Swiss-Prot record:
Molecular function as annotated in GO: anthranilate phosphoribosyltransferase activity; magnesium ion binding
Enzyme Commission number(s) of this protein: 2.4.2.18
Domain of life: Bacteria
Keywords, in A-Z order: Amino-acid biosynthesis, Aromatic amino acid biosynthesis, Glycosyltransferase, Magnesium, Metal-binding, Transferase, Tryptophan biosynthesis
Similarity comment: Belongs to the anthranilate phosphoribosyltransferase family.
Binding-site residues for anthranilate 2, renumbered to this chain: R172
Name this polypeptide is given: Anthranilate phosphoribosyltransferase 1
SUBUNIT field: Homodimer.
Keyword Magnesium: yes
Catalysis performed (reactions): N-(5-phospho-beta-D-ribosyl)anthranilate + diphosphate = 5-phospho-alpha-D-ribose 1-diphosphate + anthranilate
GO biological process terms, semicolon-separated: L-tryptophan biosynthetic process
Gene that encodes it: trpD1
Entry binding sites for anthranilate 1: G86
Record-level GO cellular component terms: cytosol
Amino acid sequence: MTISPQDALTRCIEHREIFHDEMLHLMRLIMRGEMSPVIASALIMGLRVKKETIGEIAAAATVMREFATTVDVPAAILDHFVDIVGTGGDGANTFNISTASMFVAAAAGARIAKHGGRGVSSKSGSADVLEALGVNIMLTPEQVAQSIEAVGIGFMFAPNHHPAMKNVAPIRKELGVRTLFNILGPLTNPAGAPNILMGVFHPDLVGIQVRVMQRLGARHAVVVYGKDGMDEVSLGAATVVGELKDGEVREYEIHPEDYGLQMVSNRGLKVADAEESKAMLLGALENVPGTPREIVTLNAGAALYAANLAGSIGDGITLAREAIASGAARAKVDELVRVTNQFKK
């Protein structure tokens, strides 16, 4: 079933849903560059104002995956293969907590396929801070797979894996607000990681995104929203969790105190640029006491639970503390820098 972009826009204005097959058609037009930027931006904002449904998001993610340049990984690693990602758009401008957590989780035995880009709505995207650390992010899909094998971490720079997104990038940049594409990025991991720790920018998205992951065939998904507005597990407030496990979805709240952590404001986590983010990230991995280390420990613990290496978030936190205290997490940074730079011609 097809629908014209103009009819879809009318549907958005009237707060009516765009059906699965219609959304597939519209997304393919956008990804092929066959929809004018004016109509595409109007439609993207129309969906945002209407509020995207589970069906619309799942259909859009399906098309984005169709157009992606994928990374092949061996089936043997899938049980503990995880993505740690935030939708961005939370406006918090914190250091790269999910990127720091990635090094900790890998040091504790997870295999990570991290999918990210440069800062769009933040001061420092995952690609920005990794480059500041000296990581070569311009890898081929084969090199990403080799990096996962050698280090336990593969970073997939989104523009390399979603070439069709070049048709959307100028629109996203000019709009400068969070849109459907903030929601889609975490759903379209090019390595097909079946497990995920995903932070979202709005509480309504917790239940939506976890059910989208269910439709897309994820194994273990932990979707989180900090009630202080963070797209991470927060130290400054309760965190709303949507979890998909064994095919079932449940929603609940967790608190820092549940894990023996003190509730503290996240104000001290703000950074102005990638260099500041790098300094805070390294401090956390070097076991410097303070809020950065604690929030990384908390999020890495949740990632290790999502990766099926811990029976609970609390058990994951114990593993994360050990990985930081032993120096293994900090060593992962140097390992990733060394391995990725070997690929440079």
